[in-house]
Regions:
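N-terminal Sec-pathway targeting helices
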Residues: 1-16
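Extracellular carbohydrate recognition and processing domains
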Residues: 506-547, 626-631
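Ser/Thr-rich, Proline-interspersed low-complexity disordered segments
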Residues: 17-20, 33-62
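Beta/coil-rich, acidic/histidine-enriched accessory regions frequently appended to metallopeptidases
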Residues: 24-35, 54, 60-62, 340-467, ...
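Juxtacatalytic substrate-recognition/specificity segment
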Residues: 140-266, 270, 279-303
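Extracellular beta-strand-rich recognition modules
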Residues: 480-488, 552-559, 585, 647
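Terminal, low-complexity interaction segments
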Residues: 534-566
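Acidic/His/Gly-enriched intrinsically disordered linker/tail segments
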Residues: 211, 215-223, 240, 244, ...
Length: 667
């Protein structure tokens, strides 16, 4: 998806500390959305209702030693793989058939003066329609041009106040904290653009489109300016939250230049943090998160209108990180070129930040664990402020389940890098046992078409994973068809996989397949590509007869844009009968090479974070270690100074969106 967006969340009844109003935030999938904010009744944990339906069964996951070694090898391979950043110019030339695409398009009409007019491409996010609007320049600042679509009503005093505050206050603050945008950039103009326009859709307050950073030869809907848009249908220039929207979208512009394929949850967390460090209203979405914290922090939703909790989670994590580790560490995290938790661990290592419990450099999982504990504890007196926020007071988290009568047991599951809070308050000394699963599937299917091994494309934003192999067809005179099995889940209308062929390594031809599509509503596609969902494993065929008599190199390219991505593509069971080639990938990679794509089994070692919070006269926290089979048994005493305990459970397996099963028994 090429749009970095701010969704509208209408607050129907949000009156906290005598403040009521509308809130906005975020990076969303394009679509028709108007979310209603639920009423906040109290800032305290909600009492869970015990479910009476059939609980989730904890699967039997017995593995042989060689299987354990294989899934551990999967993890090591994935940890070692660097997902390549896409190169829009290379893609436009290699797959789009363009030649000598320039990096920049200097604007011969710049600098502009107030009153001049200009035409811009904009996107209606309700229907993904791209269209043009005519706008007039209404403000020129030291750093910005502020354009307003012709016919849009506004007060000049509101414009002047907003534009001056943004130009003189927010822009310098963002640059000092998050870095510099591409400047003078694609248009060779030191000022960047803000466009206030209508028709952008009912679901957003504004968006930054990375397509605008490209030469129009590389993307048909590029404006070829550093810019972001504000939605005149949904936000007024006089309203407070538009200031936060501008800080938010400007951070996305900066981070596109600084670290283009950063994971969405991190990039979005930084944009929420931009509102925070500018002392602007970032509130609201944290409530969406804490009412159901079993949400994967490290993922981002594909469904329009369902990302409010993701904004809240990313915001809280980044504010906690800033409060806990300070401005130097947070700026180092922003500047780190590694993505996600890999970048976080790089910062911990570089700055020598130690976990006070272990005395060793913090791991990302340990920081995550401290954060989910802090969201419950929120007490600066516990372990020298390890489990609290200093610059913001979040709402209290909701309890996932509770045990008030012992013995009892719970069988459930939890998201990877999500969290369940289980309250136990039956008095007495009890034996508590925990049992987790042994492994997690990477992709949501049980097995590939044959054997155990297949290729997986991996996943990432603004990325280009590829897989290639050269076939000798010089002795072929008749039909040559490559067949293979594939499974895919790709962001609809925005991310595509292509298969292409070249006889010289320079000029490539995208090939048709049985299920590829030429539809291109976003302007992202270079030709017939796979998009959307396959609905399961399917057989594909690509005709190579036109290359008979030559050596031909085939390539699979998975090209993603910003913000949202599916789980990717899987490939298996290749056959090219014309030359007697066949590979089910069981013994080796079958001659395929590439970057980003990995050959693996559909399993990773399941790991967990387990902690116990003792609540009473004095709150304390204990991190619980698990045995090799993800189980443990220990005693807890409730009574006297301890009124209850809270079990904090998280899955911590990377690279998957599948949940982690577990069972808790108190006896």
């Amino acid at each position: 998806m090429n749009k970095t967006l701010k969704i509208i969340l209408i607050v129907l009844s949000l009156c906290v500390v005598a403040a009521c109003g509308l809130t906005f935030a975020g990076l969303i999938h394009l679509g028709n959305l108007l979310e209603a904010r639920p009423e906040i009744i109290a800032a305290s944990p909600t009492e869970p209702a015990r479910q009476t339906d059939t609980p989730i069964a904890l699967p039997t996951q017995s593995l042989e030693p060689e299987e354990l070694n294989a899934i551990q090898a999967n993890l090591e391979v994935l940890l070692a793989v660097a997902v390549p950043i896409n190169d829009p110019i290379d893609l436009a030339e290699r797959l789009g058939g363009k030649e000598n695409v320039p990096l920049t398009l200097p604007d011969p009409d710049a600098p502009y003066q107030v009153g001049e007019e200009k035409t811009f491409w904009v996107t209606n996010t309700d229907n993904n329609e791209n269209f043009q609007v005519q706008a007039t320049l209404r403000y020129v600042g030291e750093n910005i041009y502020f354009w307003i679509e012709n016919g849009v009503r506004y007060k000049d005093s509101d414009l002047q106040q907003l534009a001056e505050d943004f130009d003189q206050e927010i822009v310098p603050t963002n640059r000092e904290f998050f870095g510099m945008e591409w400047n003078p950039g694609v248009d060779d103009d030191p000022r960047f653009y803000v466009l206030y326009a209508r028709g952008l859709g009912a679901s957003l307050a504004g968006y930054f489109s990375s397509a605008d950073e490209l030469h129009p030869a590389a993307h048909p809907y590029s404006n070829a300016h550093e810019m972001f848009l504000l939605n005149a249908d949904t936000v007024r220039l006089s309203e407070d939250y538009i200031y936060g929207t501008m800080a938010h979208e400007f951070q996305h512009m900066i981070h596109w230049y600084q670290d283009r394929n950063e994971e969405t949850w991190v990039n979005e967390g930084f944009s929420m943090l931009a509102e925070h460090v500018n002392d602007l209203n970032s509130g609201g979405f944290d409530f969406d998160y804490v009412i159901n914290p079993d949400l994967q922090l490290t993922d981002w939703g594909a469904e329009t209108g369902e990302n409010g909790p993701h904004y809240g989670a990313s915001y809280l994590f980044m504010v906690y990180f800033l409060d806990r580790f300070g401005e130097e560490a947070t700026k180092a995290l922003v500047a780190n070129s590694e993505n996600g938790f890999t970048g976080l661990e790089g910062v911990m290592q570089a700055l020598g930040i130690l976990n006070p419990t272990t005395g060793q450099v913090y791991t990302a999982n340990e920081v995550f664990t401290d954060w989910v504990i802090a969201n419950y504890v929120q007490d600066p007196t516990v372990e020298q402020g390890r489990y609290t926020y200093r610059s913001y007071t979040p709402y209290a988290v909701s309890i996932s389940d509770s045990i008030s009568s012992c013995p009892d047991q719970i069988t459930s599951d939890v998201s990877q890098f999500g969290v369940d809070y289980i309250e136990i308050d039956c008095p007495g000394t009890h034996t508590l046992s925990f049992k987790g699963g042994a492994f997690a599937n990477i992709l949501p299917f049980e097995a590939p078409p044959s054997g155990d091994y297949f290729f997986w494309s991996n996943l990432g934003d603004e990325s280009n994973m590829f897989l290639t192999q050269t076939f000798d067809l010089t002795q072929v005179t008749g039909e040559a068809v490559l067949s293979f099995k594939t499974w895919y889940d790709l962001e609809e209308d925005y991310d595509y996989v292509y298969v292409s062929a070249s006889t010289d390594g320079k000029h490539w031809q995208i090939l048709d397949s049985l299920t590829c599509t030429t539809e291109n509503p976003s302007g992202n596609s270079y030709g017939c590509g796979w998009n959307g969902s396959s609905g399961g494993w399917i057989e594909e065929r690509v005709n190579l007869s036109g290359f008979a008599g030559t050596e031909v190199t085939l390539g699979f390219d998975y090209v993603t844009d910003a913000a949202v991505n599916g789980i990717g593509m899987a490939l298996d069971d290749f056959r090219l009968d014309a030359i007697g080639y066949a590979s089910d990938l069981e013994q080796d990679a079958g001659g395929w090479k590439g970057a980003g794509f990995v050959r693996l089994m559909n399993a990773l070692p399941q790991t967990y974070s387990l902690s116990v919070i003792s609540v009473g006269r004095q709150t304390s926290v204990q991190n619980i270690s698990l045995d090799a089979d993800n189980s443990t048994v220990f005693e807890v005493t409730i009574g006297g100074d301890v009124e209850k305990i809270v079990l904090v459970v998280s899955g911590t397996t990377p690279f998957t969106r599948e949940k982690a099963p577990y069972q808790v028994e108190v006896r």
